Every structure is written in structure tokens, then in C-alpha cells.
Amino acid sequence: MDDFTSISLLSLAMLVGCYVSGIIPLAVNFSEEKLKLVTVLGAGLLCGTALAVIVPEGVHALYEEALEAKHHEMGEIHKVKDAETGAEASVAHEHDHSNLHAYIGVSLVLGFVFMLLVDQIGSSHMHSADDPEAARAASSKITTTLGLVVHAAADGVALGAAASTSQTSVQLIVFVAIMLHKAPAAFGLVSFLMHAGLERNRIRKHLLVFALAAPLLSMLTYLGLSKSSKEALSEVNATGVAMLFSAGTFLYVATVHVLPEVGGMGHSHKQDLGAAKGLSRLEVCALVLGCLIPLVLSIGHQH
């Protein structure tokens, strides 16, 4: 199977899987209490996914690409010279690893800051409305969807970059990693939007945009890369960097938007402490369970 066919099939599977998992909360009629519980579970899934799946997968992709490049280089060097002192090699190895550490931090922070700026720009437009509370709620819904779409787009770039390496194992690892968090993310997004009171048709549109973002970007990335760009991308570990950038956007959405909203605290700066009741014991259990599910799935998916 050639690369184009495989990336097309993976993109289609990603679209269908994501949309179907997002439709589940819409297909079932929940009472107010159950909806809150499902929303809390969804928020837990988003946080657990960001921390237990996306960050480790991004780091893994980053180091795996570097190690493969290193093995290739070492093979070439051994062909030319068999006898070499190991001191220089170990210094170069340490230097490479410090570079990779920098990539990890920079990618995560850039993703987080990018979403922070998008949020601030969005809310500054929204807050000019007559009702600041309604404006805040609308801004929160839009930012949550936008954040997850940006995150999904970065995932798509990661998959497209992985497909361009022509290594099926890397493609499959990135695909499984993306699917492991896209399904819970779609579920979390829809349950959050339902909790926020969006109409079902609008929710379906939000979900469709989220589901389409990664497949479209993966195809565009794959088709848009020339041979020279592919080589340049493998030099800067594009797959790992894209996944870590998306992890930064994901962390922002999960922690700054969804969790406070679910906890009843929102972004509202109310002085009335009674309004921020927090979560019941059952809801806390659902939140913890949501955080643990991606962890269990990621342990099951060992490389």
C-alpha cells in the first residue's frame, strides 16, 4: 500500500471515529444531573488525555525520530571509519538531548500561549456586548471549540509529517495516539457544549468542524510537502513538535476553560463565594475516573 492510500484511509478512520464518539452524548437523553456528571467525566477525559497521552506521545515521537536519525548517521560513520574514540560521540549525544529538551518546553509553551492569545482576542471582542455574563459564556464555547480545532489541526500536521517519512510503524503509532485522545476529546467537547446550553444543531456543526480538522490538515500536509521539505522536517522532528504544540493548546482548553466551567467557577469574577459550590463527591469521582481512563488506555498501548 502506498503512502497516499494509507494516509487517506487513516484520515477517513479518524473522521468517522471522532464524529461517532462525539455523537454519543447527543444520542442519549440525559437528565440535568446526569448531564452534569457526563460533562465532568468529559472534562476529566480532556485533562487525563492531555497529560497521560499527548505529552508522552509527543516526547516519544521527538526522541524516536532523533534516535532513528542517530542510528542512520552512526551506520554511515561506521562504514567510513571503524575505529573512533567514543568521547566526541558522547558529547554530541548530550548536546542532541539538550536540544530535544528545549524543543519539548518551547513547543508546549507556544501551544499554551497561542491559545491564551486566541482566548484574549476572542473575549475582548465578546466583552463589548451589553450582557458581559452572556458574552463570557459565548466566548467560552467558541474558545473551547476553537482550541480543540487548533489542537486537531496540529495533530493532522503531525500525522501528515509522519506519513511523509514513509515509515508505516511511525504512521500507525501517531495514528493510534491521535485516536486515543480524539475520541475522548470529541466526547468531552460535546458534553461541555451541551452543559453550556448550545442547541443540538450548533453542537453537531462544532463537532463536524473538530472531526474534519485533523484529516484535512494531515492530507494537506502530506500533499504539500516536497521531497526537500520532508528531509528538512525530519531534521527538526516535525511530528514530535506538532504533537507537543497541540498538547499545549489542549492543556489550555482543558484546564483554563472546561475544568473551571464544570466546577461552577467559570471565568466569572463573582464575589459571591456561594455561587462557586464546587463538585459533589460523585462528580469528583467522575472527574478522577475521566482523568484515569486515558492513562489506562495509554498503558495498554505500549510501544
UniProtKB/Swiss-Prot annotation:
Catalytically driven reaction(s): Zn(2+)(in) = Zn(2+)(out)
GO cellular component, as recorded: mitochondrial membrane; mitochondrion; nucleus; perinuclear region of cytoplasm; plasma membrane; trans-Golgi network
Residues carrying a glycan: 29, 237
Organism (species): Xenopus laevis (African clawed frog)
Gene behind the chain: slc39a9-b
Annotated protein name in UniProt: Zinc transporter ZIP9-B
Main location: Golgi
Key words of the record: Cell membrane, Cytoplasm, Glycoprotein, Golgi apparatus, Ion transport, Membrane, Mitochondrion, Nucleus, Transmembrane, Transmembrane helix, Transport, Zinc, Zinc transport
GO molecular function, one term: G protein-coupled receptor activity
Subcellular location: Golgi apparatus, trans-Golgi network membrane; Cell membrane; Cytoplasm, Perinuclear region; Mitochondrion
Function noted in UniProt: Transports zinc ions across cell and organelle membranes into the cytoplasm and regulates intracellular zinc homeostasis. Participates in the zinc ions efflux out of the secretory compartments. Regulates intracellular zinc level, resulting in the enhancement of AKT1 and MAPK3/MAPK1 (Erk1/2) phosphorylation in response to the BCR activation. Also functions as a membrane androgen receptor that mediates, through a G protein, the non-classical androgen signaling pathway, characterized by the activation of MAPK3/MAPK1 (Erk1/2) and transcription factors CREB1 or ATF1.
Classification via InterPro entries: ZIP, ZIP9
GO biological process per UniProt: bicellular tight junction assembly; intracellular zinc ion homeostasis; regulation of cellular response to testosterone stimulus; regulation of vascular endothelial cell proliferation; zinc ion transmembrane transport
Homology family: Belongs to the ZIP transporter (TC 2.A.5) family.
Transmembrane segments: 7-27, 35-55, 102-122, 142-162, 172-192, 206-226, 240-260, 282-302
